[in-house]
């Protein structure tokens, strides 16, 4: 399966203060742009493998796509089959364009289809919120307003 995770920009960003959990309370307007990482997902016999065309990107538990796989496996008790994910990186690393968040979001979408999980939009959003502030938005992209620490998303 091939999926594309698109970069996003913040058209506006208001920091409203720091929360007790360490996150910042925000209000932001986000938009996807025409720059994307290509995510290739393939079932295999067992295990989890994440690779990336950019050697700077970790291929272990520090990678958000890897964390998305672990989250799905633990929440739905999936041990087999295995999954291989390759990220062809086009979005610059650590650029603030949500590259890693988008990779995690598309990994959630891909696993939902490959493993026939039948997860609803709401279930995907709840899982995404556990992975990072931009991941819920990156599930569906487009133009949206986000608040909280980014987990509350309303699309236009």
Put a short name on every predicted segment.
Residues 1-53:
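N-terminal, positively charged, Ser/Thr/Ala/Gly-biased leader segments
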Residues 2-4, 12-14, 18-28, 117-156:
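ATP-dependent small-molecule kinase catalytic core of the GHMP/sugar-kinase superfamily
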Residues 12, 42, 51-53, 84-88, ...:
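Solvent-exposed beta-strand sheet faces enriched in polar/charged residues
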Residues 51-59, 89-98:
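A short glycine/serine-rich beta->alpha loop
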Residues 65, 95-121, 139:
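DPxDG-like acidic metal-binding loop motif
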